[in-house]
Amino acid sequence: MSKERPKRNIIQKKYDDSDGIPWSEERVVRKVLYLSLKEFKNAQKRQHGEGLAGSLKAVNGLLGNAQAKALGPASEQSENEKDDASQVSSTSNDVSSSDFEEGPSRKRPRLQAQRKFAQSQPNSPSTTPVKIVEPLLPPPATQISDLSKRKPKTEDFLTFLCLRGSPALPNSMVYFGSSQDEEDVEEEDDETEDVKATTNNASSSCQSTPRKGKTHKHVHNGHVFNGSSRSAREKEPAHKHRSKEATPGKEKHSEPRADSRREQASGAQPTAASAAASSAKGLAANHQPPPSHRSAQDLRKQVSKVNGVTRMSSLGAGTNSAKKIREVRPSPSKTVKYTATVTKGTVTYTKAKRELVKETKPNHHKPSSAVNHTISGKTESSNAKTRKQVLSLGGASKSTGPAASGLKASSRLNPKSCTKEVGGRQLREGLRNSKRRLEEAQQVDKPQSPPKKMKGVAGNAEAPGKKASAASGEKSLLNGHVKKEVPERSLERNRPKRAAAGKNMLGKQAHGKTEGTPCENRSTSQPESSHKPHDPQGKPEKGSGKSGWAAMDEIPVLRPSAKEFHDPLIYIESVRAQVEKYGMCRVIPPPDWRPECKLNDEMRFVTQIQHIHKLGRRWGPNVQRLACIKKHLRSQGITMDELPLIGGCELDLACFFRLINEMGGMQQVTDLKKWNKLADMLRIPKTAQDRLAKLQEAYCQYLLSYDSLSPEEHRRLEKEVLMEKEILEKRKGPLEGHTESDHHKFHSLPRFEPKNGLVHGVTPRNGFRSKLKEVGRAPLKTGRRRLFAQEKEVVKEEEEDKGVLNDFHKCIYKGRSVSLTTFYRTARNIMNMCFSKEPAPAEIEQEYWRLVEEKDCHVAVHCGKVDTNTHGSGFPVGKSEPFSRHGWNLTVLPNNTGSILRHLGAVPGVTIPWLNIGMVFSTSCWSRDQNHLPYIDYLHTGADCIWYCIPAEEENKLEDVVHTLLQGNGTPGLQMLESNVMISPEVLCKKGIKVHRTVQQSGQFVVCFPGSFVSKVCCGYNVSETVHFATTQWTSMGFETAKEMKRRHIAKPFSMEKLLYQIAQAEAKKENGPTLSTISALLDELRDTELRQRRLLFEAGLHSSARYGSHDGNSTVADGKKKPRKWLQLETSERRCQICQHLCYLSMVVQENENVVFCLECALRHVEKQKSCRGLKLMYRYDEEQIISLVNQICGKVSGKHGGIENCLNKPTPKRGPRKRATVDVPPSRLPSS
């Protein structure tokens, strides 16, 4: 360091345990400072180079007595030497100052200035704890010579701070971001694994740094971070640590994790008898005297407070620890520093990260998730951890060993990592397993580790927000472990209520991250195939949950070979006979088929809000309470159209009211400062911004007035609400029957068809509820004007429905426009609200049906349907991209020559794929496609999906059962079932209906066959893509379905007449006999119906007509004046009958004055009603002769007589009757395609 460097005025910090920054931060700072303290380093070398070996021996000799001092931040030795520590410079982590009191005090002012400078850099990488390690290395001379290798200047340090993590950083400065032992790992045989663990956790911010006076404690007798063998260290490349240190985004969370790892390690020390296990435990377990040598004061000193949260240091061990005295161990003070710490409620680790990484084999390059256990993965919610939970983290279960129990206690745990560690090594405890200890464990008698003494203190995990009392530290502690026997299950039970699901949900659900993709995991490219474990998964889950689920069979799982996996329609046709009886099958592609999913994180779509507790029966205790609150608010002039949102999650007002009263009312909650606890009980995510302020605001706005009512007034409100419900049900039947189809049945799109972000049956809140007298149904306002008598009736109906229960029959509402990133955050928050740890599909399934059936709490989730024409597909579409032309790419499937839907062109929700974006509990209710079309669904990324399927053959039985269950007052059962009603498969199975089930995982297809009833429940955030297909076998079923939809006045997404005529024209040219023979009978029926209706209209007096796309020059003057020429250019989607929603393709009748469209059947009714054809005009696409000729040509080809269909269409046809005056022939080339 240059002597001309100006000194800074530094405010002296108090050297108290509760002051300053934690040692993890101190180590990080000193790591960086080491590179800029060349002079001091040289001086230390000269002064202590000769006596280093002797000091190490002295350290080893004092290990037995030193452990007592190592057991707390306020240990006896640190108290006695506090004055000496004040003389020791801040870089006492250097060679000898870290081990001896007589360290050079002359450097202290300068070093404190340096430390202060470094503290202002919260994201500065850690590169200096090497000093702590160096004196511990067995060959001190070699280590000292290594110290002098690097001679950075202050200017270099500043350059590194500015350029770290960027390509502009000079190669010569790369080593700034890592400890020296990482770079010299091949040269230094005895370098410490612990230092490498420290560098792994280098990303620590200055948010919680313990007092600087703790420096000498970490260093005194503490050069014990070595001992790991070279071979063990060489197994882990140094780039892992650099990659972690070079990620600034991780640094603000990692320092709390570092502290908690220290505490966990100290709390996880082995018992006296477990020598083998203790070798794999935290570093503090080494120099411990017998507990009898401790005073109560010593035990109290074990618990030190850091930022108001207690920190547990390791306690004394039994006699077996003497066997380890020969090994170099951390000093008493250093032991404290390397234990897990809870800082501001966040569990953090410093020391054990490397050892844990090596044992659990985590994804090293994922931010803030160094291990599969998700303490580090939960970036935002992990601050819910407390002292007691950290103690549980350090514990080990009796059967699985320390590694398993230590991981189990982490709040959101990946169970696979536990099993992996338990099988691999049972020596590690509390996430602390240095390689030195692993080596030592092999040398120590293994029978000495009784598993029962490795019990963790998991029993304390349930108490969030509580400080650990001194008594908790004084419970029979051996090597920092509470000897309390806690069953292994309690480790999982005691996890905090809201463990962060964000990282787990993302890390586990998504199958990889591509560059440029944020943590929302939009990309699903996987380096490894995820198909192999899929098939076995289905079997264990088959009967999971309740016993009644055992009656469900799993749908077939198909694994086509690479050769078979080419054309989806050919493959599906080959297996149809075996799988169609199940209604559905799951297809697992070959391992090498894994297209990458790239979605724009900022794409926006309109969500759909689903009230899970209302998906079954609409009425329940929660809904009743909410109705009372709404009724009271309405009497106060307050309208609550939507529930208040906190963190994107709807607030459960009914539960809020109940809980705040159970806690004594608002005044008591405020006086006792229990708003935080109340928010936790309501499961509001801790990551939600201003959650307490919003919670209090919601109470004052919506509950305060209701809460102030007397019990009598509450009972009166309940009676009024129940009476209103009874009246409503008498008038309209049960709430489940008041579906959106009553007011907007014609908005009911196919169950999977997206339209403006809405799905099947989502109704705007101000929908029409009128019924036309002539047809008994409410026409949908799709034309440009409403029908004549509609307006007055609509007003009357809306006035009737102004009651508080007018929309309580709904369970699905229109949401708001959100980006994909916002949707993911909401999904993460809702997952955290519903589950405290990463749930398995069986757990989600059980909780889902509990919510649906019990209806005791308000659960609102979101989902979205996005047209890929607007936002792009999840499949690759570029010509040069892999899989972009593959047959199973769902953007290619609509053009497959085996699918007759290709003749329709681009139809949203039919031949254009759409994305299904869901979160936990997102539901596709029981339904079948309204056209009975088959479809293929591919799960791009994310959590699993649970599918239920009822084969088409069960239709009649299902209708009777549903009608009985829902008591539909004459409403057909299937109509009620398709009105967003979820009935448990268990109930249906008990009624004798075949229900099949499967769990679709990422990268798998689900194929649904025509007419099957299907429902789906998402297990977390995921993205899938779906598209329809159809073969010629479907046409007969599709034709009958189209007639039924017309009868029920349901809008179809495409015209069946158009499809049949397009097939006839295209296939007749190819002389495709099988296809033509299938559609010939349907064309016959269609021709007869069309010509009969035209004849009846002509007889009724409708003589004015025109052909599509032509300008009628021969029409009368009166007709010419009123003809809306612009209307003739309207698209097919707008040419719907205003009565029955039929798509008019062959012909229609137009009310020119009102610009209203009728199909021929509804026009006949209108003419009979009005007794006049005034203002009406027939519009047609083909005249009678063309229709007859086309059908004859098709029938002729089927019977073997070949003729040209082109001649039939192009030859002039005789014009008969009054039509010839108002008709202009247009050749087929001028006909619009739509």
From Swiss-Prot:
Q: Which GO terms describe its molecular function?
A: chromatin binding; DNA binding; transcription factor binding; ubiquitin binding; ubiquitin-modified histone reader activity
Q: Which Gene3D superfamilies match?
A: ARID DNA-binding domain, Cupin
Which intervals of this chain are the motif Nuclear localization signal? 104-110
| One matching Pfam family | ARID
**Tissue-specific expression:** Widely expressed in embryos. In adults, expressed at high levels in heart, skeletal muscle, brain and thymus.
Composition bias type Basic and acidic residues, residue spans: 244-264, 418-440, 482-494, 529-544
Ranges of biased composition (kind: Basic residues): 1-11, 211-221
Where does the record place the JmjC domain?
882-1046
Q: JmjN domain location, by residue?
A: 555-596
Q: How would you summarize the oligomeric state and partners of this protein?
A: Associates with the PRC2 complex, which consists of the core components EED, EZH1 or EZH2, SUZ12, and RBBP4, and various combinations of accessory subunits including AEBP2, JARID2, PHF19, MTF2 and EPOP. Found in a monomeric PRC2.2 (class 2) complex consisting of at least SUZ12, RBBP4, AEBP2 and JARID2. Facilitates nucleosome binding of the PRC2 complex. Interacts with SUZ12 (via C2H2-type zinc finger domain); the interaction is direct; competes with EPOP for SUZ12 binding. Interacts with histone methyltransferases EHMT1/GLP1 and EHMT2/G9a. Interacts with GATA4 (via the N-terminal region).
State the name under which the record lists this protein: Protein Jumonji
- From which organism does this entry originate? Mus musculus (Mouse)
